[in-house]
């Protein structure tokens, strides 16, 4: 008889208990294994059942992360552009402003916003010149008080930047020098790159000091057609000679491309454009630590541009490194692996999975600010006064496609803040607490910090000016018809309803591009094309009947094209996934349905959407704009003709082109905030309201969400380098996560009992069968013995 059969026929209780216990553990482990960091949790009920087990067997983050000075968070969309010349989307800024350092920055705590030197010794020195190139004796600090005649004398403004000595680039293989002092990684072949997937795979790295040439190189590089920088179109009208320089680079690129075609070189391996070889009047390196930028006329807002990533330094070695044949094929570029002098460096970039920023070992440690408001003091935002930044060792951000998964992991404590690049969760949590719904109980009990501010930005819908149906029109008659169509749609879009439903009334409907918080916003109370005054100092949206009347005048009575007899169809380009996005799309369809206009929805991911907008192939679109700097010029340029996205790669997404508007903009943009400037802004408002190239949408609140162990969270869509100032208390984090995610042990003991109860009848049946078999066998043996004796 085998040992197993002997056990089943006479089981040892203690051994049976061990087997049942092992089976129970296997069952628990299998159940807990269903919850993986990749899968996330798809419902709150699932979380209630499985979270205790997950905490015991399979936490979504490694334990060692929790005890370190790591910030743990998530992101929704993989950033498409991390190159300082091309990056301009909100979801890219947490990384670009952590790695790159423009010359200026904003004081992290002060409001109103205050510009400060970042890599400079002091703020830029301004010198004014007349048309003859002679310097003017005008004090820049008293410029606002100068007469119009004196200001009109200014033909050029020179910004002089003095760079701090001793600032170092991060370690990178582009800077490696061999024993002979030669750069050793700039003559690589595709064969040399066979096992390379990131710059961290190189065994040799180096670094060097920042100098003025790096800033000059970065500015000149904005003109290359290989990158298509969204800043070049506008800056080419401001930096002296930049437009002609762009034309020169365009021709040089065409020459190199033709040469490559003749030699059979593929497009990804075009010869490197070395911008050290090309100079122009607007950018001058005086010495290794001094740079001069020459601006046409008077443009006070240029100082804000110097705080943007477009003006971050680019080392020529890095540009040459990524231009080598084979790099693009392996997705090695400044778009995926940026290089800078900032507080962090990108050390992990797994597409659609995870991105990690690690402390730059060469960073000089700029001190945390010691000045702030009484409120900042009360909130503990000055506790880290004077400490060298960054205060974190790493920022680990995981790609999350499902909002439910983000919310669950955040409430459990495994994410310190829900999302790296967006402020919507903070506002949503505030609404939840206000209404007593959702996670309100946990948010209050776990002391989640929910600071909020008014966002300097807007969400808007726009028409493509290049489109034959909703755009400019080729004849005056067509232009008038198209305008009436746009006006009718503008009236039909009930943003008051939208704000009430989707924003929980925590947003403000806009009447122009000049949003709340900007100079000139109070100069015009409402949009007279869309609203009527109600006689009590308020206003109300015009009726749908008025919109239908305009639609008929546009040639589409009842939504039918009078000429063709076919239904009017509008193509709507948008981006977004999930039930929330679908609900909003349904709302848009409902607005068009009021006019009996059919809507063709072309929903796509954000990267493809950006490509469509760059090509000018959209007809009607939805997008947002967050201010780069707190000045109306930064919004009014969204309709400036030379800033067209399709024509010049700028940020005029509607490709709006109106000569009068452009003239007013060119005059307004150079002015200080005076009554004269406000009057020009009002005229521009009238034009955009009458022509209706946009539906101005709404401006929403912007809020952060941080656990109690996160310090220094102060949300702002103007200040983009927040990551350098955030801090965590790992000990408190570990303690709270342990408290909140204690495993419920009764299933641990109950499951083996249940398994034992299920197994025991089977064991009894087996034993009975064995007893019968044994008895039968003994009987047979007895009979055989009896037969032998006979």
What do these predicted ranges mean?
Residues 344-345, 493, 508-554, 574-584:
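Structural transition elements
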Residues 122-238, 292, 406-409, 477-488:
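Aromatic- and charge-enriched surface segment that lines or borders ligand/interaction sites
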Residues 706-743:
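Long beta-strand-rich cores associated with HINT superfamily self-processing modules
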Residues 67-77, 157-161, 215, 291-292, ...:
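Short, well-ordered beta-strand elements
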Residues 55-60, 64, 443-447, 454, ...:
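Extracytoplasmic/peripheral linker and loop segments enriched in polar/acidic and small residues
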Residues 107-110, 240-290, 294-405, 544-545, ...:
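Gly/Pro-rich hinge or "lid" segments in bacterial periplasmic/extracellular proteins
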Residues 72-151, 339:
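N-terminal lobe/hinge region of extracytoplasmic solute-binding protein
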Residues 347-358, 383-384, 396-470, 496, ...:
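Extracellular/periplasmic solute-recognition and catalytic clefts
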């Amino acid at each position: 008889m085998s040992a197993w059969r002997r056990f089943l026929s006479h089981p040892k209780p203690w051994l049976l208990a061990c087997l049942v216990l092992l089976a129970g553990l296997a069952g628990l482990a299998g159940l807990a294994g269903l919850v993986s960091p990749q899968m996330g949790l798809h419902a709150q009920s699932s979380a209630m059942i499985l979270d205790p087990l997950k905490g015991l067997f399979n936490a979504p983050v490694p334990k060692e992360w929790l005890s370190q000075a790591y910030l743990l968070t998530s992101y929704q969309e993989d950033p498409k552009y991390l190159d300082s010349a091309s990056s301009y989307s909100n979801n890219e800024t947490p990384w670009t402003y952590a790695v790159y350092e423009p010359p200026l920055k904003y004081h992290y705590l002060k409001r109103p916003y205050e510009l400060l030197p970042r890599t400079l010794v002091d703020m830029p020195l301004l010198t004014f010149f007349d048309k003859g190139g002679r310097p003017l004796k005008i004090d820049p600090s008293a410029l606002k008080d100068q007469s119009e005649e004196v200001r009109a004398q200014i033909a050029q403004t020179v910004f002089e930047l003095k760079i701090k000595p001793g600032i170092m680039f991060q370690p990178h293989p582009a800077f490696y020098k061999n024993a002979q002092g030669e750069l050793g990684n700039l003559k690589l072949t595709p064969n040399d790159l066979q096992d390379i997937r990131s710059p961290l795979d190189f065994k040799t790295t180096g670094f060097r000091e920042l100098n003025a040439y790096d800033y000059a190189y970065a500015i000149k590089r904005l003109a290359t057609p290989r990158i298509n920088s969204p800043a070049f179109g506008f800056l080419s009208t401001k930096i002296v000679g930049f437009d002609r320089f762009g034309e020169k680079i365009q021709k040089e690129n065409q020459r190199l491309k033709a040469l490559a075609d003749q030699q059979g070189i593929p497009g990804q391996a075009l010869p490197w454009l070395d911008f050290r070889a090309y100079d122009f009047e607007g950018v001058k390196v005086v010495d290794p630590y001094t740079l001069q930028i020459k601006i046409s006329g008077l443009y006070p807002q240029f100082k804000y541009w110097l705080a943007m990533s477009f003006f971050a330094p680019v080392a020529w070695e890095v540009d040459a490194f990524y231009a080598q044949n084979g790099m693009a094929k392996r997705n090695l570029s400044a778009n995926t692996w940026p290089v800078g002098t900032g507080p962090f460096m990108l050390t992990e970039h797994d597409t659609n999975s995870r991105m990690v920023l690690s402390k730059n070992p060469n960073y000089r440690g700029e001190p945390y600010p010691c000045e702030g408001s009484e409120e900042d003091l009360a909130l503990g935002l000055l506790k880290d006064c004077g400490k060298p930044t960054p205060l974190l060792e790493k920022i680990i951000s995981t790609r999350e496609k499902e909002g439910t998964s983000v919310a669950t992991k955040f409430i459990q404590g495994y994410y310190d803040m829900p999302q790296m690049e967006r402020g919507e969760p903070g506002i949503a949590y505030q609404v939840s607490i206000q209404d007593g719904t959702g996670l309100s109980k946990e948010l209050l009990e776990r002391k989640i910090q929910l600071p909020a501010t008014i966002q300097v930005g807007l969400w808007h819908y726009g028409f493509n000016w290049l489109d034959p149906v909703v755009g400019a029109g080729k004849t005056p008659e067509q232009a008038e018809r198209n305008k009436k169509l746009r006006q009718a749609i503008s009236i039909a879009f009930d943003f008051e309803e939208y704000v009430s439903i989707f924003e929980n009334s925590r947003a403000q409907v806009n009447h122009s591009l000049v949003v709340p918080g900007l100079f000139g916003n109070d100069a015009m109370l409402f949009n007279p094309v869309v609203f009527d005054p109600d006689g009590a100092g308020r206003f109300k949206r015009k009726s749908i009947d008025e919109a239908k009347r305009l639609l008929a005048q546009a040639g589409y009575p009842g939504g039918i094209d009078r000429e063709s007899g076919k239904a009017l169809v509008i193509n709507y380009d948008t981006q977004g996934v999930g039930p929330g996005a679908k609900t909003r799309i349904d709302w848009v369809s409902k607005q068009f349905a009021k006019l009996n206009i059919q809507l063709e929805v072309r929903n796509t991911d954000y990267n493809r959407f950006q490509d469509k907008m760059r090509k000018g192939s959209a007809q009607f679109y939805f997008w947002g704009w967050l201010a780069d700097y707190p000045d109306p010029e930064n919004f009014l340029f969204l309709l400036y003709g030379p800033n067209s996205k399709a024509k010049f790669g700028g940020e005029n997404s509607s490709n709006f082109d109106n000569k009068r508007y452009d003239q007013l903009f060119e005059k307004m943009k150079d002015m200080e905030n005076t009554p004269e400037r406000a009057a020009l802004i009002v005229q521009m408002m009238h034009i955009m309201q009458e022509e209706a190239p946009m539906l101005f949408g709404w401006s929403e609140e912007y809020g952060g969400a941080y656990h109690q162990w996160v310090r220094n969270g102060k949300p702002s869509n103007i200040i983009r380098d927040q990551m350098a100032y955030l801090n965590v208390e790992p000990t408190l984090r570990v303690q709270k996560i342990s408290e909140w995610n204690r495993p419920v042990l009764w299933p641990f003991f109950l499951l083996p009992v249940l398994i034992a109860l299920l197994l025991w009848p089977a064991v009894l049946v087996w034993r009975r069968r064995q007893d019968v078999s044994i008895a039968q066998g003994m009987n047979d043996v007895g009979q055989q013995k009896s037969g032998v004796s006979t």
